[in-house]
Design a protein with these regions (language model features):
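Catalytic phosphate/metal-binding cores of nucleic-acid and nucleotide-processing enzymes, i.e., regions
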Residues: 1-142
Length: 142
């Protein structure tokens, strides 16, 4: 399968996961027909990078998401937390983000504690979406 088609399918699958959780998610390219958006849009506060790769370098993927979300911030002043949602063939979806970003989502960031900023955390989709939904509900005041 060519990698572009595999990428599109992955983005559609992730958008569907968010839709099943109640979000109006869609592919970023589909959103306006051009680049400059996350791979999946319609999820508040999050920059989503989707990867389907057997040999994924997660650190490089996070760095790409950080660069792209920083560029988006420069254009829009909307600050989004970068997350990479990824899977290998026949495995479940996983979510990886910086530890500091995850702690800001979970609401358990003690300001007096120094945490290495290069620390990455990977968790299953089901665990991550529970943390994210609690954060989003609290932040939106719903």
């Amino acid at each position: 399968m060519n990698s572009r088609a595999k990428g599109v399918r992955g983005e559609l699958q992730v958008a569907h996961l968010f839709q099943k959780s109640g979000y109006k998610a869609e592919r970023g390219q589909q959103h306006d027909g051009r680049s400059g958006h996350a791979d999946v849009v319609g999820v508040p506060y999050i920059w989503i990078e989707v990867k389907r790769d057997q040999d994924l370098n997660v650190l490089k993927a996070i760095e790409q998401a950080e660069r792209d979300s920083a560029g988006y911030y420069e254009r829009t002043r909307e600050d989004l937390l970068p997350v990479v949602i990824h899977r290998k063939n026949r495995e479940e979806w996983k979510c990886t983000m910086r530890l500091l970003d995850l702690l800001s989502l979970s609401g358990s960031m003690p300001f007096a504690v120094a945490v290495p900023t290069d620390g990455l955390v990977t968790m299953t989709w089901s665990d991550w979406i529970r943390v994210y939904m609690a954060y989003e509900t609290e932040r939106s005041g719903a």
